[in-house]
């Protein structure tokens, strides 16, 4: 009988203040996060960004207790999922693979091989696919498979996205409903979805399906919420966590909060739609930064829907995804790691320079300008990057 391993993919996060710099370096070394036309620029640029952003990021992590809870919560999710699977007759062992911090993907692969796993289900803890999240993790796993004959012999099936899974949609609707009913005027509360943003070029030029999946997911949740409540709440969607001067998906969360406040919204239910675990974006960015913006603009009652964490229906949904994958609904790792044809990442074909609409050309030129700005600011201790919020 095959030994089943369920590999949960997630971002990772620094558990201690001293981990912040190395974590940022790992993050920005990934070409799916910052796409450059020349590979040699990647690690020097990552080093500079991590050096210059460490202080600000450390301050943010101090405000939530000194480190990210993401590993602890993800491991709780893994234990709950393993227990649920075994209770329904699936003898599986769960493993956690973080992309940019411990436990790294290599460690999870080594553990699966040591345990004698022969069949692997790869489940990203990102409901919505993006080339910069699930795509990067799948691609890293594919790299390990290509370089490890023993790992390559395993049967590997993947779940690419699951934003429309009924249990996920229902879990979100249930948690939102609780916050709406806790408002003084439930029918007048505004439901505000905020998702992690990505550069606009990823969607418009690289063909990333992320924005479409976020929008469709929001509508599915709203439909279920209306059926459950029996009344309709106004709602909106925005994107957070923008970094650097490049245009990201709009509207931006902080700008929508200002508009909602000025339009007279007093009760706001904030939904972190792309996050299934509490971490820096929910605990610091939403709970502290965005709450302050909302209150400054007249929003009196700011309620934030908790992340799913180990919500029972959510765990049940993850188990159903695993079960379906084992029954043939998953896709191969090769298919899961395949990027849209318009995306160029390392290893790349010979680069063609020229004045055209390729996002990589422009990203490369911008990267060189930013690189020079970094060097200048290292010397003078200030400059334009402070003004645009990168430092």
From Swiss-Prot:
The EC code for this enzyme is 4.98.1.1
Its UniProt entry gives the catalysed reaction(s) as: heme b + 2 H(+) = protoporphyrin IX + Fe(2+)
One GO MF term attached to the UniProt entry: ferrochelatase activity
Compartment(s): Cytoplasm
Q: In which pathway does it act?
A: Porphyrin-containing compound metabolism; protoheme biosynthesis; protoheme from protoporphyrin-IX: step 1/1
Question: What SUPFAM superfamilies does the annotation carry?
Answer: Chelatase, Chlorophyll a-b binding protein
Q: Where does Fe cation bind?
A: 196, 281
- Among its keywords, does the record have Metal-binding? yes
InterPro entries assigned: Ferrochelatase, Ferrochelatase_AS, Ferrochelatase_C, Ferrochelatase_N
- Keyword flag Cytoplasm: yes
Which segments cross the bilayer?
none
Taxonomy, superkingdom? Bacteria
Q: Which UniProt keywords apply?
A: Cytoplasm, Heme biosynthesis, Iron, Lyase, Metal-binding, Porphyrin biosynthesis
Question: What processes in GO biological process is this protein linked to?
Answer: heme biosynthetic process
Q: Name one GO cellular component term.
A: cytoplasm
Please give the NCBIfam families that the UniProt record associates with this protein: hemH (TIGR00109)
Q: What does this protein do?
A: Catalyzes the ferrous insertion into protoporphyrin IX.
Which family does the entry's similarity section mention?
Answer: Belongs to the ferrochelatase family.
Q: What name has this protein been given in UniProt?
A: Ferrochelatase
């Amino acid at each position: 009988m095959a030994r089943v391993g369920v590999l949960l993919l997630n971002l990772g996060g620094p558990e201690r203040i001293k981990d912040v710099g190395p974590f940022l370096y790992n993050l920005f070394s990934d070409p799916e996060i910052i796409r450059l036309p020349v590979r040699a620029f990647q690690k020097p640029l990552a080093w500079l960004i991590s050096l210059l952003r460490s202080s600000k990021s450390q301050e943010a992590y101090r405000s939530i207790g000194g480190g990210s809870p993401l590993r602890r919560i993800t491991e709780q999710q893994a234990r709950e999922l393993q227990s649920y699977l075994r209770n329904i007759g699936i003898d599986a062992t769960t493993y956690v693979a973080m992309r940019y911090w411990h436990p790294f993907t290599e460690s999870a692969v080594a553990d699966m091989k040591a345990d004698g796993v022969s069949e692997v289900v790869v489940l990203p803890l990102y409901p919505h696919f993006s080339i910069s999240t699930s795509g990067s993790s799948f691609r890293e796993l594919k790299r390990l498979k290509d370089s490890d004959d023993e790992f390559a012999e395993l049967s590997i099936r993947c779940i690419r996205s699951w934003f429309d899974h009924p249990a996920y949609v229902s879990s979100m609707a249930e948690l939102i409903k609780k916050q709406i009913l806790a408002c003084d005027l439930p029918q007048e509360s505004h439901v505000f979805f905020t998702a992690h943003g990505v550069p606009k070029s990823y969607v418009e030029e690289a063909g990333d399906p992320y924005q479409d999946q976020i929008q469709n997911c929001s509508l599915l949740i709203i439909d279920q919420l209306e059926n459950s409540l029996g009344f309709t709440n106004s709602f909106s969607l925005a994107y957070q966590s923008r970094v650097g001067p490049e245009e990201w998906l709009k509207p931006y969360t902080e700008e929508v909060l200002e508009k909602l406040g000025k339009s007279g919204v007093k009760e706001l239910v904030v939904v972190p739609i792309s996050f299934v675990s509490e971490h820096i974006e929910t605990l610091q960015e939403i709970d502290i930064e965005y709450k302050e913006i909302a209150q400054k603009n007249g929003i009196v009652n700011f309620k934030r829907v908790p992340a799913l964490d180990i919500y029972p229906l959510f765990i049940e949904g993850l188990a159903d995804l695993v079960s379906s994958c084992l029954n043939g609904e998953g896709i191969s790792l090769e298919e899961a790691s395949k990027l849209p044809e318009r995306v160029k990442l390392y290893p790349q074909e010979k680069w063609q320079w020229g004045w055209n609409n390729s996002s990589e050309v422009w990203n490369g030129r911008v990267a060189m300008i930013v690189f020079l700005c970094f060097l200048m600011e290292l010397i003078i201790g200030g400059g334009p990057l402070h003004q645009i919020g990168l430092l």
